[in-house]
């Protein structure tokens, strides 16, 4: 998603909204959370939710603008966002793309296709393989 943001941030506004914790330590802890050291209890206050979001942004150097759902979970309820989901809202405020629920139906490549159709594809220069001369000069 960060690469998608970097590619299209000059054409579209991006926002990540932190909703309730997907795998909190006091509910359904995952081994991957322990491995990646992202272990949090389910926040009980907005201040706790803000602290977790700020920790995420800082630890992962996350560049996408961040919003935080309130404790009534209004954004989560309106967009069925938990545990993760992608949306494109068009310039008229209408939902132009509604992705499936993550993690299995979380498909940033579908958002990329929508953005490419709307704004044009972003080309990335491919890394060149080492030349044969460079490999033979080491022998």
What do the predicted segments below correspond to?
Residues 5-8, 18, 40, 62, ...:
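Sequence-level detector for tyrosine residue identity
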Residues 9-13, 61-65, 83-84, 91-92:
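Loop/turn elements at helix/coil->beta-strand transitions in domains of secreted/extracellular proteins
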Residues 17, 67-69:
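Conserved beta-strand termini and adjacent loop/short-helix elements that scaffold enzyme active sites
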Residues 70-139:
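Thiol-/selenol-based redox modules, centered on thioredoxin-like
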Residues 1-60:
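Structural microenvironment flanking redox-active thiols in thiol-disulfide oxidoreductases
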Residues 43, 64, 71-74:
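Gly/Pro-rich cap/lid or specificity-loop segments adjacent to the active site
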Residues 33-37, 66, 73, 95:
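General secondary-structure edge motif
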């Amino acid at each position: 998603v960060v690469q998608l943001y970097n590619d299209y941030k000059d054409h579209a506004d991006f926002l990540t909204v932190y909703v309730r914790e997907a795998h909190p330590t006091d509910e359904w802890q995952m081994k991957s959370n322990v491995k990646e050291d992202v272990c949090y209890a389910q926040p009980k206050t907005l201040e706790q939710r803000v602290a977790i979001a700020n920790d995420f942004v800082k630890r992962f150097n996350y560049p996408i603008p961040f919003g935080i759902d309130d404790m009534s979970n209004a954004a989560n309820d309106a967009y069925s966002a938990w545990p993760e989901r992608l949306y494109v809202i068009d310039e008229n405020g209408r939902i132009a793309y509604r992705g499936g629920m993550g993690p299995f139906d979380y498909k940033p490549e579908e958002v990329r296709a929508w953005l490419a159709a709307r704004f044009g594809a972003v080309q990335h220069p491919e890394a060149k393989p080492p030349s044969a001369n460079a490999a033979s000069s080491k022998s």
